[in-house]
Amino acid sequence: MEQVRRNGMIDINAAIEQGLIQYNEAEVHGARKNKFWFNNYTWMYKEVDNDYNTYEEYAEIICYELSKLLSIRSAEYDLASFNGKKGVITRSVINDNEKLIHGTELLNEVYEDYFVLKQTLHKSFKNLLEQYNIKTLEEFHKLPEQDKISFQEKLMKLYNQSCVNPEDFINDLDEININDLFNYCLELDGLYPDNFVDMKNGIISSNNLYDIWSAVEIYCKISGYTLDTKSFMTDLTDMFVFDLITNQGDRHADNWGIVIDRDTNIIKLASLYDNSGALSLNREKAIVNIDDFSKRLKIEKRPAKVKGIYAKMKETIEHSFSGVKIYAEDVLERRKNTKLIETYISDSSEEFQERLEEKLSLITDENIDMIFCEIESKTHQPIPDVVKNVARQILMFNKNKINDMLSVKKGGEKR
């Protein structure tokens, strides 16, 4: 659609007039028609904020180019306009033989189809213990033989009611290892939390690496899908790291998903999409302040003043923090990136720490310039200087911050 690029943006109205874009009412999202699929759901147009001096469209396209540099899969983005409003177009993250399941849908389905069943099993198990006036496995073994048999029959029935897949059913008392089953039911207490899908400041409490991973494993089990464990975990942590590097603070559970291959039943993490909340380019005041602070730091020579200006810039940059956390308590406590980085470094294997270091090593002034050149070459339009400066400041700040924390972990000194 290069023939309808105007002022750096794909002109959607011109593309429609020339027959390059077709869409129908079913593909439209929202009453204002500011978000719609076109060309048989292969591309989407999305209007960005037009009321403030923000640059969400550049956040999307810079993150797309950055993801390529870091070898992280991401949806393709380009600048676009529709009805005089600026926006972006993005290619679908799925092919014809694939299905996208958003994180919210996945987490809720796992909760309803698995966690609730296990919670019900535990409550029923406690009632069964009361019925037989026992509390422990040892007390069970002291029951009269007939009571032990009836207890096992009832427990087998309760367990089967909690199973999603028929192949997990216990069909005969001879199949029961009562010690294992008794302890399994006992240990369900607190294992599947009631607040798994509760919201905290708009974020589902399970929107964290640990719970996402657990939910995907369970989803595969109850749905019969196949999971490449290492590949999925790598992609999941790459998403988390990408958000830390870019200050992506809007990775709620509708802004990530899984892709199911209908032919092979293999599940993978969807390519990254919707990065309009990255690089602070959606925050008007932050854009102005980061740009101003960075310019003042270049000319200020007085140490006390430099320290004060840097502290203000640091506070502004760190105001945004990752939507995806590591553990549920990180979500509930609304922990910011410094704590998340510390936990990630502490709890990650050496392999994942090295992977983090490799990605950080690619964030250089030269590579950032290369990203800007790639975008300007594609759009035939200069990127606003303020966008370049703010994006560069955030990327380099986060790179240096994470590297410093890695150095401390290894017993070295900060930069």
Give each language-model segment a name.
Residues 3-146, 150-189, 193-194:
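Conserved ATP-binding subdomain of kinase catalytic cores across diverse folds
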Residues 38, 198, 261:
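Acidic surface patches and DE-rich sequence motifs
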Residues 38, 45, 77, 90, ...:
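Generic structural hydrophobic/aromatic packing signal, biased to beta-strands
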Residues 55, 60, 68, 142, ...:
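Conserved kinase catalytic-core segment
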Residues 77-84, 252-262, 408-412:
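Short alpha-helical "patches" and their helix-cap loops
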Residues 125, 129, 133-145, 151, ...:
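C-terminal catalytic region of ATP-dependent kinase domains
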Residues 159, 173-226:
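A short mid-domain helix/strand-loop element embedded in enzyme catalytic domains
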